[in-house]
From Swiss-Prot:
Protein name: Angiopoietin-1
Lineage start: Eukaryota, Metazoa, Chordata, Craniata, Vertebrata
Gene designation: Angpt1
Glycosylation, residue list: 92, 122, 154, 243, 295
Pfam families to which the protein is assigned, alphabetical: ANG-1, Fibrinogen_C
Cellular component GO terms held in the UniProt record: extracellular space; membrane raft; microvillus; plasma membrane
Amino acid sequence: MTVFLSFAFFAAILTHIGCSNQRRNPENGGRRYNRIQHGQCAYTFILPEHDGNCRESATEQYNTNALQRDAPHVEPDFSSQKLQHLEHVMENYTQWLQKLENYIVENMKSEMAQIQQNAVQNHTATMLEIGTSLLSQTAEQTRKLTDVETQVLNQTSRLEIQLLENSLSTYKLEKQLLQQTNEILKIHEKNSLLEHKILEMEGKHKEELDTLKEEKENLQGLVSRQTFIIQELEKQLSRATNNNSILQKQQLELMDTVHNLISLCTKEGVLLKGGKREEEKPFRDCADVYQAGFNKSGIYTIYFNNMPEPKKVFCNMDVNGGGWTVIQHREDGSLDFQRGWKEYKMGFGNPSGEYWLGNEFIFAITSQRQYMLRIELMDWEGNRAYSQYDRFHIGNEKQNYRLYLKGHTGTAGKQSSLILHGADFSTKDADNDNCMCKCALMLTGGWWFDACGPSNLNGMFYTAGQNHGKLNGIKWHYFKGPSYSLRSTTMMIRPLDF
């Protein structure tokens, strides 16, 4: 604040003092101002112009009063009286100025207090409004911040849950990856081992192939030599067969001679036994042999009606009273029973081992009188069983050697494994069964098949351990089932009235 004051009296006194000893200086003829700073307020005093009668200062370096910056210069020859008067006047003015200053200070204090009070009131109202506005804005911002915080917390919770799930999933994936890595390592080790073994096997295989090639070449040479030998043997066999035919003719002639001799002896009644004459007749079967006094099992010669040649057969004199003519026997698989019609017709094998008597001879025997059939069976566990039929005979070749049976008994099943109502005989080259499947080819051997049927004693021979699950083996269904191949079989016949 700047206050401009004119003090006429004070100006007159200063004029009087200034004009007492100096002259008017035309350069200092204008008004002069004196400014005093007190706190925030500044005071400016207007000083009057100097009178023209005042003397000019003889020197500017002489200063009569250091406190009065604008006081006029006096000459050093002023009298002491003037100086004292001037000092007295200055003291009075100084006191007056102090009073004036005190007055101004007191008035300024009250004014400043009023101004400060008004400013404080105005500032308080403004601050209240601003505070209210700030409070409202703060509350709104707080509410928004609370909502944002809630959203952030919810989002944080979801993110934490998702992070936890991702962590669990990552842990599981890491675990699975570790397991798969371990498995891959194991597989790699196994592959390395297998590759090593394969390399070893390839080396061995190569060596074996080389060995087999050498053996093949050797075998080819051997086969060539054996082929030549076989051809030579076939030639020798052909010559031997011719010789055998000659021997057979000689044997027939000898048998005729023997028959003639027997006939002559019979006519003359020349046969002594125990001192009595008995008439000797040719043996029709093993029952005749047994009744003739030969009660030891073995090979005997029997004669057939309407057949030019006798036949060697095996007679069983031990089972169930003896007198049995054996028509089939299997025991060791040494004989192949997969043969054709002609071979089954005339028979094959050795009566002392495995053999088939022949359908033509079986027909000839069973046509003489009534016969019964007994079948002896044994499995690979040593169990024995039998089936027996009270009536047995077969038809001729035109009838395909049809089988006729009656009256089944025995321990090899409550039911008969042979067809009782009649079945034709079939071989691999003569299919007479009631099936389009050709049972003789599938089941092997010649037999009385009826849609294959539950039995085949002329099937394939299987050894122990390989006899299970064999449909084409030696089977008797109601004894060991349809796929069990038996160890041995014997078919034999005896007259019903024995």
